[in-house]
C-alpha cells in the first residue's frame, strides 16, 4: 500500500500534434515501466484510428514507479486525456481524477485553441500546472517566445518551464523530478465510506465492461458489492488492478489510487463517465460534483450503400455503442436511401471516427446524410418538440417559432489571416464577442449558430488561413431565429436526405447553389429532369437537366415531312410518359457535395 504522500496523479494537456503521446511514451520508457522490446509508438493509444489520426479518443492510464533523486519510491499515475473539443466532457472528468497537469506546448508553434480549452478544464479542477516546452531539438524552436506567450495568453508563470525533446529523450528526467516536487499529493481518508469516481469505461469481450476508477475515500477490494449512485445498480467486483500499461491484478485500491475494476457489467451504458461508485452497504449517499449524462449534439443518418448489408450495419452500430455511451442511434427509413440509422454524436470528429470505424472494422460502405443539430420547435398550442431531422419538420402553419443551438467559438489566428476569418464568421451569421492580441496572433471569440459550423466550417477555416488557425467551441444555449426548412425536389419528388434547415435570408442563395451542384452531379437520363429548391410550396430556385436525345429521324431519307413529324411526336409522347414513371438515380457523391457550402 503506497502512502498518500508518495502518490502523484497527473494528466498531460496539449493541442493535437504537440507531442503529448510521445512524451507519455518517453516517461513510460525511461522508468522501465515497459521493456524496450515491447515498446511501440503511442503506447497508450489502443485504437488503430487513434494511432493513424494521431489523436487520443478514450482516456488511457498507466501507473509508473519512479525512484526520485532523494532515493524514495513514488507511484505516478498518468491519465492521457483526449485533446479534441468533441471529447471535452471526458477531459473535464479525467481532470477531476488527478491533482496536476503537464502543459505541453510545441516550442516551434506556441499556444493553440485546444491547449487553451483544456488548460481551462485543468484550472477549473484546481490543478497545479507545470509548463513543458517540447520539440526543442527542432531548428525552429523558440522557447523564450513560447514561454512569454504562455504567460500572456494563459496567465500562468512559465519562467521555470521544462525544456524537453520527447523525440530524443532530452529533459525527461527533469520532467519526472518536477512531477514529484511540484505536483501535490492526493488527499483521502482510508476509513471513510468508499467514494470512487468513474473516469472511463470500455467493453471487453471476455471480461465485460472494464471500469477505470479513481478512489477518493475508502478502500475497494475484490469481492465487494458496489453501487452506482446515478442509477442505483449494484454489481459484484470480481477483479481489481492497475495498468502498467497492460492490466495487472492487485488485491485492493486505496485513497488517491487510480486503477480498474470488472464486475460482469454487460453494457457501457450502465457505467457513466463521472458517476460515483460506493459500497452497497455502508456506502456514501453524497455524489461527487459535476456529473452529467453526455448528450449528443450533432445528428446524421448512416445508410449502407448496398441495402443487403443493413443487418451487418446494425451489428456494427450495436457493438460500437457497447463501447461508447455518448453515441446514440435509432432506426430510420428514407425514400431515397432505404433502411438505415439516425445517429447522435458529440461533434464532427466523433462522427468521423465512428463512420471510419464502421467502414474499416466491419467493411461496410456507408452513405452519410447531412449532419444536423437539435432545434427546439415551439408550436402554437404551447408544445415544444425537439427536431433531430429536418425531414420531420411539422407544418409551418402550426409552428409559433424555432430556436437553434448557439456556440461560443474561440479562434486563434495569425494577424495576416484575421480579415478572412472575420469574413467567414460574418458569413456564417456570427456575432463578434471579443478580439485580443497576443504577440503576432489574434484571439477572436464569436457567438455562432451550431448549424453553420457543423458541416464544413472547420475545413473552410483551415483553407482561408492556410491551416494556421486553431478552433475550439463550447455550447452556450438556444436562441430564436428566422429559420425555415428547405426541401430539394428532383423530378418533382422531394429527396428527404437533402432537406436542410436554413435562415430565411440565406435560403435563396443556398438553394440556388445546391440545385446548380446537383445539375452537374446527377447523370443525364432519357427524359428532362427539373431540380428545384422549395420552402413549403414555394419554389425558390430551379435548374433543368436536359434529356439525352436519340435521333429518331436518322433513317428517313428526303421525302415526306409528315413522316418525320410523326416519329418526333411519338418520341415526345414517350419522353413524357418516361418522365411520369421514370426513376432518377442520384449518385452518393451528389448528397455530400450538394451540402458543402462554398464561400
UniProtKB/Swiss-Prot annotation:
GO process terms (BP): positive regulation of translation
Enzyme Commission no: 3.6.5.n1
UniProtKB keywords: Cell inner membrane, Cell membrane, GTP-binding, Hydrolase, Membrane, Nucleotide-binding, Protein biosynthesis
Uppermost EC category: hydrolase
GO molecular function terms noted in the UniProt entry: GTP binding; GTPase activity; guanosine tetraphosphate binding; ribosome binding; translation elongation factor activity
Domain tr-type G intervals: 5-187
GO cellular component: plasma membrane
Subcellular location: Cell inner membrane
Predominant subcellular localization, coarse grouping: membrane
Keyword Cell membrane included in the entry's annotation: yes
Highest taxon of source: Bacteria
Known catalytic reactions: GTP + H2O = GDP + phosphate + H(+)
Primary role: Required for accurate and efficient protein synthesis under certain stress conditions. May act as a fidelity factor of the translation reaction, by catalyzing a one-codon backward translocation of tRNAs on improperly translocated ribosomes. Back-translocation proceeds from a post-translocation (POST) complex to a pre-translocation (PRE) complex, thus giving elongation factor G a second chance to translocate the tRNAs correctly. Binds to ribosomes in a GTP-dependent manner.
Family note: Belongs to the TRAFAC class translation factor GTPase superfamily. Classic translation factor GTPase family. LepA subfamily.
HAMAP family per UniProt: LepA
Protein name: Elongation factor 4
Species, as recorded: Roseobacter denitrificans (strain ATCC 33942 / OCh 114) (Erythrobacter sp. (strain OCh 114))
